[in-house]
Regions:
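A conserved regulatory-domain signal marking ACT and ACT-like small-molecule sensing domains
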Residues: 1-169
Length: 169
């Protein structure tokens, strides 16, 4: 698992992926996104070389681009992942602790969160917090929907759930 973070600039994805390609790496699941003024990459890759050789090849590129990286050997293989069966959207007035409260309630209702994205919109005097979650409803949709209804009522947010059917092919 390769994790990189640094100030956003053009060419990060191209240069990092080029290093991995040159090492005969096969990329699997990846998340690459800009957060604030930073860019972050988390990706799985199968690379035939030893971990220290990968670090040696990545370091000059990371130094040049101002990136920090962390590399871990993991057991999971490429293309061995769980697909989400539900998408949840929560939005309302920005309030401290909403992510902790929402994810606690959803976890207790059996949701295994696979992806969570959030943003703050609106205006400085009335910010709106928006959260989108994809996951697996381990205890079923009804249990999850009940938890969302309680959350919406208690925290005065809009909480919506949509079952999804994802196909990877």
């Amino acid at each position: 698992m390769l994790t990189l973070v640094g100030k956003d600039r053009p060419g990060i994805v191209a240069e990092v992926s080029r290093v991995l390609f040159d090492m005969k790496g096969n990329l699997g699941e990846a998340s690459m996104t800009r957060l604030g003024g930073n860019f972050t990459i988390m990706l799985m890759a199968s690379i035939p070389e030893k971990i220290n050789a990968v670090e040696e090849k990545l370091q000059p590129v990371c130094d040049k681009l101002g990136l920090f990286f962390h590399l871990d050997e993991i057991e999971a293989g490429l293309h061995q992942h769980v697909e989400p069966d539900v998408r949840i959207s929560i939005h309302g007035a920005d309030q401290a602790g909403i992510v902790a409260l929402a994810t606690d309630a959803l976890g207790a209702a059996g949701l295994n969160i696979l992806n969570l994205e959030s943003d703050v919109g609106g205006y400085p005097e009335s910010p709106v917090y928006v959260m989108h979650i994809e996951g697996v409803a381990g205890k079923g949709f009804d249990t999850l929907n009940k938890a969302l209804q309680v959350l919406a009522r208690e925290k005065e947010v809009v909480a919506e759930m949509t079952p999804i059917d994802t196909m990877v092919g």
